[in-house]
Amino acid sequence: MTNYPFFRQGTIFVDNSAIQRNSENKNSLSIENIFGRFPKEFFQFFSINVSKSTTKKSSVVIKPSTITAPWLENEYLDSNTSLLSVHSIQPSFIGMSDFAIGLDPSLKRILPEIRFRLDFQHLKSIAKGATSTIKVVTHRDKITDAKIYYAAKVYRKTKTSHKKRLNTMVYFLREWSIQPKLDHPNILKVICPCVTLTSVFNKSAGFCLVQEYCPQGDLFKQIEEKVLTLEDKCCYLKQILQAVAYLQSQRIAHRDLKPENILIGRDGLLKLTDFGTSEIVGNPGDNESIRFVSGAVGSLAYLAPEAFHENEYCGLLADRWSCGILLKVLFTGYFPFKTSVKTDLYYSKYMSILTDTCGISSTDESSFQTEVIKQIPTLQPLRYIPEGAKKIILSLLNPDSQNRPSLDSILGTAWVRKLDCCSNFSTDHENKSLQEVDFDASKPITRKSLIPRIHNHQTLV
């Protein structure tokens, strides 16, 4: 049986509208176009060259479609100012020693919860992505003297191009503007941003986000090593649906849903992370003013069909397709298609069967599901998974985005409601301060040391 192999997917960011603009105007890629009036000193942390015109007063105002930062929009835009009203930040580090470092108040205004790398001790690097490196760090509680473990996502500066350095800043600001505002047990908690320099002139200067430490790695590894039982997979399915349904309720398009971006917490709960490509597309509860997104953003095998052939599309509906691919990989270990374009043999066959049986209306039809599983090798493993899971996956994999079911409706189905799920979690830690949150990885994880759950997804040591 022929199947598309399962492998790690890199994130791509191809903005079709930006490409079109750049072809018309070679100077269209600028800090001012992306951020509005942003102080040039802020970008010195990433060694980004800024032209003098960037910091001049202008009528350019940050818009939600430009960068998703609600805490900035509320503070600056509501008072009829553009980002930023502070025209010259001049971040200066003061004090006689490294332990007396202080930030310029104006930079603190942008990142009010910012801390310093000297608050943390670096232990080791555990992962490396396109724009960042994940490092395990510790913080010693000043009162109890206990070590607390965290994961620091360090955004690397690149020496290659202005565009890549600018993209790194975009990822950082997007993650910090979105992720800390989310309150859900299946969303990775960000503790604070952190400056990674002792001098503003330090060439290694930059920023990082201090997050929960998930010592068991990502979901990709568990799928790859084939250690998950059917019970585990069903539990994970429900947790994934809960996490993405929560994002949809908050009108946030993640745009890069994949196993690599789902971590396994110390208590065995899934933690969705990596919001560097995410966008806020509307206000919670408002179905009338949802803003469309553009470009092929995410990972190729998980991208919805509309990302390849439409200039603008609904990011929330595209996430539902990605969720379907993710669940298919979770249960079978194979991609259904290399990409959801007509040049892909199996996707083309999928579309042909759908047209013949349903007229491209619903992938819920039993006749369609029977035929695609029979005729498409990459979908044949679906015959061996629970009927409920199969129906969910195929219903989400509808080329017509308007006919993809909402995740709330899926969570409300009888089959999903009956699933045993690790949902008896506590969220008490989510509102505590940095000193109070304790993710201690100093001790080996054993089944006896864990808080009782319905399932134990931990790897035995």
Swiss-Prot record:
InterPro entries attached to this UniProt entry: Kinase-like_dom_sf, Prot_kinase_dom, Ser/Thr_kinase_AS
Superkingdom, natural source: Eukaryota
Residues at the catalytic site: 256 (proton acceptor)
MF terms in GO: ATP binding; protein serine kinase activity; protein serine/threonine kinase activity
Nucleotide-binding found in the keyword field: yes
GO terms, biological process: G2/M transition of mitotic cell cycle; meiotic cell cycle; regulation of polyamine transmembrane transport; signaling
Localisation per UniProt entry: Mitochondrion
Domain Protein kinase residue range list: 120-416
EC code(s) of this entry: 2.7.11.1
Reactions that this protein is recorded to catalyse: L-seryl-[protein] + ATP = O-phospho-L-seryl-[protein] + ADP + H(+); L-threonyl-[protein] + ATP = O-phospho-L-threonyl-[protein] + ADP + H(+)
Main location: mitochondrion
Keywords from the named record: ATP-binding, Kinase, Meiosis, Mitochondrion, Nucleotide-binding, Serine/threonine-protein kinase, Transferase, Transit peptide
Residues reported to bind ATP: 126-134, 153
GO cellular component entries: cytoplasm; mitochondrion; nucleus
Function, in words: Has a role late in meiosis.
Family: Belongs to the protein kinase superfamily. Ser/Thr protein kinase family.
Identification of the protein by name: Serine/threonine-protein kinase ppk24, mitochondrial
Organism: Schizosaccharomyces pombe (strain 972 / ATCC 24843) (Fission yeast)
Taxonomy of the source species: Eukaryota, Fungi, Dikarya, Ascomycota, Taphrinomycotina
UniProt gene name: ppk24
